[in-house]
């Protein structure tokens, strides 16, 4: 346990920041899940409206991830990893791989 006043204050600040970061990560994960579910919905029923939904959800998730990296909630490599996961899912949904020529 903290002994002096400054260390007690740092404990309080660290706890406050932990809760704020937790909430930010949670909202980021929610946006990512929305993007993945939009990709699944597009696969089920392709259309212009579904494609727009996929693009919009991806843009929102990318924005949230970039802001998390900027705020120090996520490491930049972790942010890049999450954005790559989203990009792969969206690319698979919108531009499915053509059948092999062999």
From Swiss-Prot:
Record flagged with keyword Glycoprotein: no
Keywords: Ribonucleoprotein, Ribosomal protein, RNA-binding, rRNA-binding
Protein name as it appears in the record: Small ribosomal subunit protein bS20
InterPro entries per the UniProt record, alphabetical: Ribosomal_bS20, Ribosomal_bS20_sf
Gene Ontology CC: one annotated term: cytosol
MF-aspect GO terms: small ribosomal subunit rRNA binding; structural constituent of ribosome
Classification of source organism: Bacteria, Bacillati, Cyanobacteriota, Cyanophyceae, Synechococcales
UniProt-listed Pfam families: Ribosomal_S20p (PF01649)
GO BP field: translation
HAMAP family per record: Ribosomal_bS20
Role noted for this protein: Binds directly to 16S ribosomal RNA.
Family according to the record: Belongs to the bacterial ribosomal protein bS20 family.
Key word Ligase present: no
Cystine bridges: none
